[in-house]
């Protein structure tokens, strides 16, 4: 959600825009993100709260407000903002991600894990979102699932050998259910088969020269 450049202070730009009368939603939102990106969480909350009151159907503004409230130390207000916004925009990806991050920060990783699973059973995750799910599972003590998600992260990044390593760790995790064990093993078999197919497609070094002799 926070799109302000971390290396560039955009506050002066937005202050100038607003001073010139360009004070629409975009300018005010940009001003808040610039404040948040440079340590002005309290100022960002004030601006975003006003925008949120006027545009309660915007998950983008709600997500930014919740994040700003977390940064300002207003944890209860942030969690309430996220909860209310998700009722209006269930499974909104940026909003759910920010809410999950907030839950992890306050020690509610298991809720974050469940929330992310629900989201990504309906929306295909990016590699970084898979990694976040792994972090949530690990923080919740769901070790086997955490390794499994990291295997999926490596698959998404094209590193199948690392995926196999993570699946081996997943299968060695304690307290697995039979369903988990079967799921992890099935995925392991799929990945190993993919590695085997890939190796067969690649010619051996010097293979072409040998064939031409």
Map each language-model feature to its residues.
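Structural marker of alpha-solenoid helical repeat scaffolds
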Residues: 20, 54, 88, 122-123, ...
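Alpha-helical adaptor scaffolds
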Residues: 59, 63-144, 148
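Extracytoplasmic and endomembrane cell-envelope/extracellular-matrix remodeling and assembly machinery
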Residues: 1-84, 115, 159-161, 165-169, ...
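Short amphipathic alpha-helical interaction segments
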Residues: 138-143, 155-162, 176
């Amino acid at each position: 959600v926070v799109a302000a450049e971390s290396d560039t202070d955009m506050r002066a730009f937005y202050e100038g825009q607003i001073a010139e009368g360009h004070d629409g939603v975009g300018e005010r939102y940009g001003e808040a993100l610039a404040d948040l990106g440079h340590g002005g969480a309290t100022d960002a909350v004030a601006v975003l709260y006003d925008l949120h009151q006027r545009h309660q159907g915007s998950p983008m503004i709600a997500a930014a407000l919740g994040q700003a409230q977390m940064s300002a130390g207003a944890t209860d207000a942030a969690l309430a903002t996220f909860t209310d916004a998700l009722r209006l925009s269930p499974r909104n990806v940026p909003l759910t991600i920010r809410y999950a991050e907030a839950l992890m920060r306050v020690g509610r990783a298991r809720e974050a894990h469940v929330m992310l699973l629900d989201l990504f059973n309906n929306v295909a995750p990016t590699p970084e979102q898979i990694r976040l799910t792994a972090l949530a599972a690990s923080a919740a003590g769901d070790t086997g699932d955490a390794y499994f998600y990291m295997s999926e992260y490596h698959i998404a990044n094209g590193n199948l050998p690392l995926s196999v390593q993570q699946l081996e760790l997943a299968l060695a995790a304690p307290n697995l259910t039979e369903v988990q064990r079967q799921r992890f093993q099935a995925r392991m078999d799929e990945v190993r088969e993919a590695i085997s197919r890939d190796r067969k497609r690649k010619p051996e070094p010097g293979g072409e020269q040998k064939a031409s002799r």
